């Protein structure tokens, strides 16, 4: 289907040229064909993004600073190319073009996050509401709806307000629960008449483990003996404290939405979790147990409270009094606090049992007593992508979904991220940089794995590819590219469809 509105001439030419290239570029011989028509009726396909990685306009439109602004500017050495998200993919200015790209591919939905500090520059109601920020997101939502694309909104994708970090250490304080709830309520009031799917938090595991255990992500806290070279932190306590407060903020926000807005707005609300799949390093009971502990410490950390009202038994046993406890009231509040679960899957690891530590230097990174690796006996679990942590293992996608089905009562699931990156090779001519056949293979095989899980009863209702565009990839900066559309960082952030964009367009034909 043609995109509404005129496409820039260069972009149109690229589409026409690549339509020829893409038609035969990826040889899927040996793999069953897959398309939209393979999936259940009403299944949603979309792409995903996040505010700090995409928007830019960091100092425009009344936006206040987030912890990622501070982290990238004060610690450029922690970013591979010393870059930041000041401009990012410039979706703050180019959002209409982004929506045209989605529409042209035939995408049903777009998952994006709201920048908390674009709504509340100082993080709380006391600092005032930024009307320019409200206007920007209204414009984006209305543009999406005018092109037939459903908005799925994430309220928090790691860019918490620096003002709240300064005031009470952000998510280390229970004070953030009410401030987050106030922020969420503004979004429900302003956008909820048109937005029918809400996600409170994106990947609390990543935020808490990288932000408070290793110090590799904002706010850059860790114990002094960790490799993150942090000036402050406690890797054995703070990750658990921060994520405890995220779970409580999530649950309070869900209660608010269900009590005041859901009946009128008729939307749904959930949370996005991430998990790798874990394969025992060898066929031993100790390594089987290590794989189970690994998934408990990454996924069960959040899923167990949401389903059962408490943390996994393995975490309670190994972390002890460093793991916060839920009161009876909190347990009841968190349990069942979702309409759906967003699930992000990228990769798998082998899990190898570790003996108990000496009790010194406690850290989330070693509490699970599982050594995680992508390589066994010199052989990787799957092809390695540009990011050193990302090994391609489609089978794990199916295994994870069936694990969720069998262990957590088969909740409604949306795959809110799935994707792969390549290196940003600045020497490649544009036409070569658009040939991302490895990404097409990744999507083809993962969609087949997803389809297999659905046929075996997994209750999955939608799939969002990560990502619509190349973008600022956190500590990797702009050294890797996850987009199905190429962003030219040297020429006004122009967008060019990669082969995978054409593949998706063909896949999504109705």
From Swiss-Prot:
Pfam families: Glyco_hydro_1. One of its GO terms (cellular component) is extracellular region. The keyword Kinase does not apply. GO terms for biological process: carbohydrate metabolic process. Its EC number is 3.2.1.21. The active site is at residues 203, 417. It catalyses: Hydrolysis of terminal, non-reducing beta-D-glucosyl residues with release of beta-D-glucose. Its main location: secreted. It is found in: Secreted. Keywords: Disulfide bond, Glycoprotein, Glycosidase, Hydrolase, Secreted, Signal. GO terms for molecular function: beta-D-fucosidase activity; beta-galactosidase activity; beta-gentiobiose beta-glucosidase activity; beta-L-arabinosidase activity; glucan exo-1,3-beta-glucosidase activity. Residues 1-24 form the signal peptide. The keyword Disulfide bond applies. Disulfide bonds join 208-243, 222-230. InterPro entries: Glyco_hydro_1, Glyco_hydro_1_N_CS, Glycoside_hydrolase_SF. Glycans are attached at residues 122, 229, 361, 371, 425. A beta-D-glucoside binds at residues 53, 157, 202-203, 346, 417, 466, 473-474, 482. Belongs to the glycosyl hydrolase 1 family. Hydrolyzes p-nitrophenyl beta-D-glucoside, p-nitrophenyl beta-D-galactoside, p-nitrophenyl beta-D-xyloside, p-nitrophenyl beta-D-fucoside, p-nitrophenyl beta-L-arabinoside, cello-oligosaccharides and laminaribiose. This is Beta-glucosidase 12.
């Amino acid at each position: 289907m043609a995109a509404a509105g005129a496409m820039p001439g260069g972009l149109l030419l690229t589409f026409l040229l690549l339509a020829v290239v893409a038609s035969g570029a990826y040889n899927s011989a040996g793999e069953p064909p897959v398309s939209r028509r393979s999936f259940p009726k009403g299944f949603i396909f979309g792409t995903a993004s996040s505010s700090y990685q995409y928007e830019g306009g960091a100092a425009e439109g009344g936006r206040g600073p987030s912890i990622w602004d501070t982290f990238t500017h004060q610690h450029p050495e922690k970013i591979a190319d010393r870059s930041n998200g000041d401009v990012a993919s410039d979706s703050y200015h180019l959002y209409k073009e982004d929506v045209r790209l989605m529409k042209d591919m035939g995408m049903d939905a777009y998952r994006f996050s709201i920048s908390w500090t674009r709504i509340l520059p100082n993080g709380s109601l006391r600092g005032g509401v930024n009307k320019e920020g409200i206007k920007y997101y209204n414009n984006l939502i209305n543009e999406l709806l005018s092109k037939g694309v459903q908005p799925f909104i994430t309220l928090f994708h790691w860019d918490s307000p620096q003002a709240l970090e300064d005031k009470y250490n952000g998510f280390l304080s229970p004070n953030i629960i009410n401030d987050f709830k106030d922020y969420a309520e503004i979004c429900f009031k302003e956008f909820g008449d048109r937005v029918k799917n809400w996600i409170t938090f994106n990947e609390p595991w990543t935020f808490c483990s990288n932000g408070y255990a290793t110090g590799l992500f904002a706010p850059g806290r860790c114990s002094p003996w960790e490799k993150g070279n942090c000036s402050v932190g406690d890797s054995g306590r703070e990750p658990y404290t921060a994520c405890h407060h995220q779970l409580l903020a999530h649950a309070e926000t869900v209660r608010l939405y269900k009590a005041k807005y859901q009946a009128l707005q008729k939307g749904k609300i959930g949370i996005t979790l991430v998990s790798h799949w874990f394969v025992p390093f060898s066929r031993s009971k100790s390594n089987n147990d290590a794989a189970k502990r690994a998934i408990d410490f990454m996924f069960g950390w959040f899923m167990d409270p949401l389903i059962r009202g408490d943390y996994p038994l393995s975490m309670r046993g190994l972390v002890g009094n460093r793991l916060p406890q839920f009161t009876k009231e909190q347990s009841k509040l968190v349990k069942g606090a979702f309409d759906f679960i967003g699930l992000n899957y990228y990769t798998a690891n082998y899990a190898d049992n570790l003996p108990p530590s000496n009790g010194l230097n406690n850290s989330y990174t070693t509490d699970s007593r599982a050594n995680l690796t992508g390589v066994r006996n010199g052989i990787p679990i799957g092809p390695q992508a540009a990011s050193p942590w990302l090994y391609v293992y489609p089978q794990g996608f199916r295994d994870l979904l069936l694990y969720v089905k069998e262990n957590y009562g088969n909740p409604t699931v949306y795959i809110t991220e799935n994707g792969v990156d390549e290196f940003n090779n600045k020497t490649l001519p544009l036409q070569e940089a658009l040939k991302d056949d490895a990404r097409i293979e990744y999507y083809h095989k993962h969609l087949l794995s997803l389809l297999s899980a659905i046929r075996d009863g997994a209750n999955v209702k939608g799939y969002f590819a990560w990502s619509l565009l190349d973008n600022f990839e956190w500590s990797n900066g702009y050294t890797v590219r996850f987009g199905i559309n190429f962003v030219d960082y040297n020429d006004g952030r122009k967008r060019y469809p990669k082969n995978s964009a054409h593949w998706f367009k063909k896949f999504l034909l109705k």
